[in-house]
Structure formats: C-alpha cells, structure tokens
A protein has these predicted regions:
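Rossmann-like NAD(P)H-binding beta-loop-alpha module
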Residues: 161-169
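Contiguous beta-strand/loop segments that form the cofactor/metal-binding neighborhood of enzyme cores
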Residues: 172, 176-275, 311-327, 343-344, ...
C-alpha cells in the first residue's frame, strides 16, 4: 500500500471509530455534559430526575428544556443551567449533551423523547414507567442498541444497599426464587390474570384513557399469577384505593426456611423471619430488620426527596457508560417490567395464560 493510501485509510478508520464510540468524559473536560427535559404541568420533572445532577460531581447541567415558560425559568434556576429551551429537540441539536434526563412522569412523551436522545447520541436517565406499549418499548430498545447507548430507568429499589443484604439472605432462607419480582425471581414464563370493574369482568366498554398519559386503562380489581422458574410462583392483587392501601403496598417472599417482606425505594423497610411454617405468631419466631448496614443494624441513611436513590442511579449510569456495560436497571428491565403489566390485560383478553415474551406488542386493551 502506498503511503498516501495508508494515511487516507487510517484517517477514515479513526473517524469511523470515533463516530461509533459511546460518549465519555474527555480528559480535558472530566465532567459529563448533562441536559434535562421536563414538562411542567404534564409530568413535570418526575421524582427529582432534574436536581439529582446537582449532587453528581462528575456531571454538569448545561441546559434544560421545558415547553412551559415559567417552569423552564424555575428549572434553569434550581439547576444552575446556563441555557434553557422551549424545544427539547433544539436543545439536543445545539448543546449535544452526553447524558439526558428524560424526567416527565407522564408516559405519552417518553417514546418520542428517548428516540430523539438516541438520534443525538445521548445516554438517558428515564423516569418510570418506561412507556405506554411494548411496540414503543421495542422502538426505544432498537434505537439505543443501534448506537450502543445506555438507558437507566428510575427503579430505585434495584439500587438499594438494603436489598443487597436481603438478596444474600435469601440464599440462607432457601428461596430459589413487576420489577422487584424479576429482581428476585428472574423472568416470568407466563401470566394468568382476571381484571374486574364493579364486580364484573372488564369488556371494551370499560376501557378508558388513564391519567398522566398512561394510555388505555381498565378495571378496579386485578388478580394475577406469574410462573417463574420451577418451582417459583408470583402473585399480585390490587383493588381501587381502600383504607390502608398505601401501607400494604410491597412485596413478600416465601422460602423453605422463612419469609421476607420489603417496601420499595432506595431505602426500603425490609424484615425477615426464619420460620419454615410461615406462621411466626404460632412459632413465636421473631421478625428481624434489615437496614442498609445489615441485619439487626439501625438505619443511618436518609433519603429526602428520593435524592439518595436517584444519585445511585446516576452514578451507575456513568459507570455503565465508562465500562460499556448495562446499568443495574436498564432499558431491557424497563421493557420487561412493562411486559409483566401488559401481560395482565393480554391474559384477561385471551381468558387463558399468556406466554412471555408476549407476541402481542400493541396494547391488549385495544384488542378487546
């Protein structure tokens, strides 16, 4: 090969490599350029997915986008963002951030915002749930995979130091066990569910548009059974809000040697009892607390405004970017959790167990 051809081909190869390489902090600028997308009045900024970056020293917020003028000005002030935009697409084009918080809580915008971020080559921190349908989720996964981009979804409990102790304990309790079920038990194989409204099975007439851009919704009573790997089963039941509903929300795991209960969040309340009968009232076995410091240790951490959990997610997203691995709660986990939810309606529609992954990618309620 001639010298001129060698130089030309080498330059072309380096250019292609640079284009394919995921964004990372440069030596001359160790801070990641972060942008925030919010939507005041229609999902706002989620559960603190904007201010989390104020507590991440490896990152610097360079801009915020919000279609609402007052909300935009307020966000720019609390984030110390030097620039603010009404159009998030224009912000992505002008600022070229490396990481973007897609913060609105409402789901009707998640798909479009994430696709725009992927097109601009940005990694994403996304408010949960992921989106409205599996069809949208598949599009998001494909767009991120195309450019080797990472997405972390704000399922805080996955990052909990408390649950790290709990997962180790499950081995002792003998457990071979929608996101927390998968965290402990893996992917479900099938789902069987019944959905009722006013005491009767739902029909097309019961389908309505859910609040906060959630998409189609139906039912005020849901009962679900999931089959995980042998011999593990999972059960989920819910009714329209009744007295004490918030206090009952959580997950309970039954193993051959005991029971573990947990709430959600980065610092959940976790208790376990070593009792093969699962009847501690009869056996007199004592419930024991698990904190982020371990078994029977007092909890010394706090999480005001969910800032502790959000920071864990943001730091793990940066770790994933730098190591070219997946975040603990990634785009595939977000899609799988959504699939478990939509499998409920698909099983009801079929009046039979629905195998997972679902073949139906549109919302099952639109097919009733």
């Amino acid at each position: 090969m001639k010298r001129r051809e060698f130089i030309r081909n080498t330059a072309a190869g380096l250019a292609a490599l640079a284009a394919a390489r995921p964004h990372s902090a440069k030596a001359e600028n160790p801070k990641y350029k972060v942008a925030v997308i919010g939507r005041t009045g229609r999902g706002n900024y989620g559960h603190g997915l904007d201010v989390v970056w104020n507590n991440v020293e490896q990152a610097q917020v360079v801009a915020v986008a919000d279609e609402d003028a007052k909300g935009r000005a307020a966000a720019a002030k609390r984030l110390n963002a030097p620039r603010a935009y009404a159009d998030y697409r224009l912000m992505l084009e002008k600022e070229r951030p490396e990481i973007v918080s897609v913060a609105p809580r409402w789901l009707d915008c998640h798909r479009d915002m994430v696709l725009a971020c992927a097109e601009s080559g940005c990694h994403v921190l996304l408010e949960k749930p992921m989106c409205q349908t599996l069809e949208q989720a598949d599009e998001m996964v494909a767009a991120l995979e195309k450019k080797n981009l990472k997405l972390a979804i704000a399922h805080q409990t996955r990052y909990s130091p408390t649950l790290q102790h709990a997962r180790r304990l499950l081995m002792v309790l003998g457990t071979h066990v929608m996101d927390l079920m998968r965290l402990f038990a893996g992917d479900p194989q099938w789902c069987f569910a019944r959905v009722r409204e006013n005491g009767k099975p739902i029909t097309r007439d019961d389908v309505r548009d859910g609040a906060e851009g959630i998409g189609p919704l139906a039912g005020d009573e849901i009962h679900v059974m999931y089959r995980f790997g042998e011999p593990t089963m999972g059960y989920f039941s819910t009714h329209r809000a009744k007295d004490g509903a918030a206090a009952r929300f959580g997950l309970r795991l039954y193993g051959t040697k005991g029971v573990l209960t947990t709430t959600t969040g980065a610092l959940p309340e976790v208790w376990f009892v070593e009792d093969p009968s699962w009847q501690p009232g009869r056996s007199k076995a004592r419930w024991r607390r698990i904190s982020s410091n371990g078994i029977d240790q007092p909890e010394t951490r706090t999480d005001p405004g969910q800032s502790f959990g959000n920071r864990l997610i943001a730091l793990d997203l940066i770790r994933a970017v730098e190591t070219d691995t997946q975040p603990k709660g990634n785009v595939y986990d977000g899609r799988a959790a959504l699939e478990m939810i939509l499998a409920v309606y698909e099983s009801h529609r079929l009046n039979a167990p629905a195998s997972l992954p679902l073949k139906t990618r549109v919302h099952p309620l639109t097919l009733l």
